[in-house]
Amino acid sequence: VEPLWTKKPADLKDEDYKSFYRHLFPMADEPLFWIHLNVDYPFNLTGILYFPKIKNNLDIQRNRIQLYCNQVFVTDAVEGIVPEFLTLLHGVIDSPDIPLNVSRSYLQSDANVKKISGYITKKVSDKLASIFKNDREEFEKKWDDIKIFIHYGMLSQDDYYDKAKQYFLLKDTDGKHYTLDEYAEKVKE
């Protein structure tokens, strides 16, 4: 059976992604959404990353992303490959371009690993921006579940902060959501 992450996103339906998630994480709630990674230049990377529904702080688990090399499982300790603020995501990444038997400090200095980490951050940011732009109401409904990723990313990575500030939300006491720019305008009034 061909692994789902090796297929083209256009050939897959939402149910395929959900079924694969249930296979990987049978006890987890349905994911909020997912990102299908598929790039072959300047490095090879395929995979599917899922945003899990996090019910409470006790539910936060790391090491839920499985690393494969040419469809052979390597590890679920992906620190250094996946940006730290995204290690709470669930899923699979597969790349022959990640050195396998090296120290964490070597990984952090490897050029391909840095590119892969940056690519994953960009894809996550693009997906969040797309949901925000195309269906803000749906984005606001998911905000309480995804804000931990966005907060942590904005605090830990300057380049992510610059991207995320466009869809970062604040909630007032009435439960209405505002972007930073909208909130600044409201305060001026």
Question: What is each PLM-predicted segment?
Answer:
Residues V1-E189:
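Conserved GHKL (Bergerat-fold) ATPase module
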